[in-house]
Regions:
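Mature extracytoplasmic or organellar-lumen-exposed domains after removal of signal/transit peptides
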Residues: 1-153
Length: 153
């Protein structure tokens, strides 16, 4: 559910769909909290922080840190192009976070820019983490992903 949340709810739901990445035209009314237009970025950033905290084993509402996906990748000594994979993933999360921090409210970005280039560039940075999580991380851990939901789950 972790990768599914990141890819479908955070990346696609909060950014990609309103940006029109999947439909070809922007859908500003699909921005989260459309009528409270100034908080969409905060909601996105909160979700991204939760994803990164989970990745790093940071406990909710606490300074406690435990075992994590990052610590497992580190224990496996997982490298990508000679660099530590957990560091690359964290760096990508940070890059995406910084790009979103530089944006106006999502609704304003979409409604006032045609195309909303700055937000599309931020979306691209969010997207770059998907193959790192979905391909590199799960491959290193020798696990498979199945997003099919079956009866009896």
């Amino acid at each position: 559910h972790y990768i599914f949340y990141y890819e479908k709810y955070l990346r696609a739901g909060k950014m990609g769909i309103p940006l029109g990445v999947f439909s070809g035209s922007t859908l500003p009314r699909n921005v989260e909290a459309y009528y409270e237009a100034t908080i969409s970025n905060d909601l996105f950033l909160e979700g991204l922080s939760a994803v990164q905290d989970f990745f790093n084993g940071n406990h909710f509402n606490s300074s406690t840190q435990g075992e994590s996906l990052a610590s497992y990748l580190d224990a496996l000594n997982t490298l990508k192009n000679g660099e530590d994979l957990s560091t690359l993933i964290n760096d990508q999360f940070n890059t995406a976070k910084n790009m979103v921090l530089d944006l106006s409210a999502f609704r304003a970005e979409i409604e006032n820019s045609n195309p909303p280039t700055s937000m599309l560039l931020a979306y691209d940075e969010v997207q770059k983490a998907v193959p790192m999580l979905k391909v590199d991380m799960v491959s290193a851990m020798s696990i498979s992903i199945d997003f099919v939901d079956a009866d009896g789950d």
